[in-house]
Every structure is written in structure tokens, then in C-alpha cells.
Amino acid sequence: MTKPSNDEPPLTNVRDLEAMLPLEEEDLTADSQDLEYTAVAHRQQFSTDLVRLYLQDIGRIPLLKRDEEVHIAQQVQSYLRLVEIQNRAAESDAAIDQYQTAIAVHDQLLVQLGHRPSYERWAKILGQTVATLKQTLKSGKKRWAELAGLTVEELENIEKQGITAKAHMIKANLRLVVSVAKKYQNRGLELLDLIQEGTLGLERAVEKFDPTKGYRFSTYSYWWIRQGITRAIATQSRMIRLPVHITEKLNKIKRAQRKISQEKGHTPKIDEVAEELGMTPEQVREVLTQVPRSVSLELKVGQDKDTELMDLLETDTQSPEDELMREALQNDMQEILLDLTPREQEVIALRFGFQDGVAHSLSEIGRILNLSRERVRQIEAKALQKLRHPRRRDRIRDYYENLG
């Protein structure tokens, strides 16, 4: 864990600025209509003042030059490789698992309290003595360093540099978040909330950026920022009242329908869609029954009713950012698949089109591998169970929320 710098950093959370602005008192002698108008005006002015202060704050941070960007990204990746070693070991190494549990509790307390917890409070939550907690941290850090082939001092230096570099990269690109967020105003969320969600997307971009690929970070991070913002609009706004998991299933069904239609030249039946997705026909019908049938895609939505519903739904158009993300997804998937057996790798690669870009049905895979459809299903189920482990699942989850 890294000690905070003595320098006061620019605020990355726009809501942190709220305490800096005084609220004006309402005119209690006004009638109810005037009070409502005054309240709305105050909220609008309050939001404008927050954005202005936020822009002034991040405007003091210099943009990164290309060589600085590469150097900082390398420090982040060096640290994240150590984190990956730790995560892999936690599945079977007791010392690492206990260390991770202790750190997770520390981080939760840090968020709740707003400051670092005392060892006494930290140990109490874990049900340990302070001495036991300190030994857990020492043993876990030592084991982590051993697995990484480093001394504890070397590991802590890389950890400190990586955490500092990650924060630096985020702060240096907050202006891009504001720029993207402004494009999605008046769609159900305030600009401040859009900036907040975009910043979370930026953080994901910093974690996944590979400086050896040759493209600029701004190009790469644009997709992640946009992904964070558009997902927040779909999830939190009141324009579309479908749960996120239903929306995701609908998108999968839509893609399957499109694929079958292109391959077979007819409108797919529910049974065909179900087989393609590994679902039962009843499950597909259940999802489809939750779609409002009377809503026009030309329906005007948003605060000013100037956005069509179609604008918020997926399209078949591939942007350069989407193509870049597909390449990144392929790279991440190749690494994740190494955790599977060779036969499981074959089945998953064919099922999701990782080999030739064509996603095959269970029956097709069975013919290719000379296996029964049921055997292919069993292999796929076992492989997917492994891939659902949080360490692997979280690595690719965000891709599938926006990529088809």
C-alpha cells in the first residue's frame, strides 16, 4: 500500500467539490411556483459551478507527452502483472488468500471511514489480534514476492510506482472524460454523473492499456470512457425501465437472430435462437416477453426530448474504437484460454469464433471434433464454469457490455 503524497492532488471525484460551494437560502415569502422555479434555478447554477470548478482544477494538470505516456503505462503494467500473479496464487495458496482478504477489508474500511483504519479496528473486523494481522500481511507479502521472483523491497517499489502512475494517468486524461461526457448530456443523467461514470471507464482503460501496440492512449481510452457513460445511461436513467441483465440477454438474442438470418436466409425460429445461445426455448420466450411491444424506435426521449430511442440502441456500424477493442479482447481471451485444457480451448474457440471469426453451434462443433452434441455441451459447460471465476470474468466483462 502506498502512502499518499503530501501535495494536495486535483480532485478526481466531482462530488467532492460539493462541500466547497455554499447553498443560497430560499425566499420563504415566495409562493409555491416561485419556490419551485428558484429551486430549479439553484440546482442548475449549483451544477454549473461544480463543473466550472472541476474544469479549473483538472486544467492545471499538464497533458502527457508520448514518451511520458509510454513510461507511465509501463509502470502501471509492471504493477498489474504482479497483481495477476497474486490473483492466480490466491486460488490455491493460503498465505496469499488470507493476505487478499485482509487487504480487501482494509480497502472497505478506507472507503467507509474516509481515512486509513487503525490496526485495532482492522483486526477486529477480521476477527484477529493485531499481532496475527501483522503476521498475515508480512507472510502474504513475502509469499507474493517469492512467486514474482522479487525481494519484498523490489515488489513494494513496483507496487508504489504502479499505483502512483495509475493515478497520474487518470488525472492527466480527465479533460477527455469531460469532452466525451458533454456529448451525452440531456439523456437522463446530469453532466456531473456522466463525468463520474466516464472516469470509471477511464480507470479501466488505464488498467488495460498496452503501450507496445503503438496507438495513443487517448484513442484507446475513448472507447472505455464512452462505454462507462452509455452503460450508466442505460442502467440509471428512467428512459428505459428494463433491468441491465435483461438488456444484455436481449442484445445476445438480437445478435443470434442476425447471425442465423444471414447464414440460413430466413427469419430464425425461437428454437434455432435457443440452440445458438445454449438456452431453452422457454428461456428465450421469457426474455422476449419483457420487451415493450408498443415503443417506437423513433420515440423522443431524454430531458429535452431531442434524442431518439434508436440512438441509444446497438447498431451494426463498427467504429475504429470498436475494432481496436475487438483486437484487445482477442488478446485477453487468448491469455485467459490458457487456463483451460486443450480440448476445452478448442470447443470455446469454435463456439465463440476465436479461430476464424465464425461462431459455431454445438452440433457443428461436434461434427468438426467428431464428438456428440451432448459431449460438446458438457465440455463447454465445464470450460465456462472455469471462465466464470471472478478473476477471469472481470477481465473481459466490460468488452461484452458494448461489443457485439
UniProtKB/Swiss-Prot annotation:
A motif (Polymerase core binding) lies at residues 193-206. SUPFAM superfamilies: Sigma2 domain of RNA polymerase sigma factors, Sigma3 and sigma4 domains of RNA polymerase sigma factors. Pfam families: Sigma70_r1_2 (PF00140), Sigma70_r2 (PF04542), Sigma70_r3 (PF04539), Sigma70_r4 (PF04545). Coiled coil: none annotated. InterPro entries: RNA_pol_sigma-70_dom, RNA_pol_sigma70, RNA_pol_sigma70_r1_2, RNA_pol_sigma70_r2, RNA_pol_sigma70_r3, RNA_pol_sigma70_r4, RNA_pol_sigma_r2, RNA_pol_sigma_r3/r4-like. GO terms for molecular function: DNA binding; sigma factor activity. Keywords: DNA-binding, Sigma factor, Transcription, Transcription regulation. One of its GO terms (biological process) is DNA-templated transcription initiation. Residues 362-381 bind DNA. The keyword RNA-binding does not apply. The keyword Transcription applies. NCBIfam families: PRK07598.1, Sig70-cyanoRpoD, sigma70-ECF. Sigma factors are initiation factors that promote the attachment of RNA polymerase to specific initiation sites and are then released. Belongs to the sigma-70 factor family. This is Probable RNA polymerase sigma-C factor.
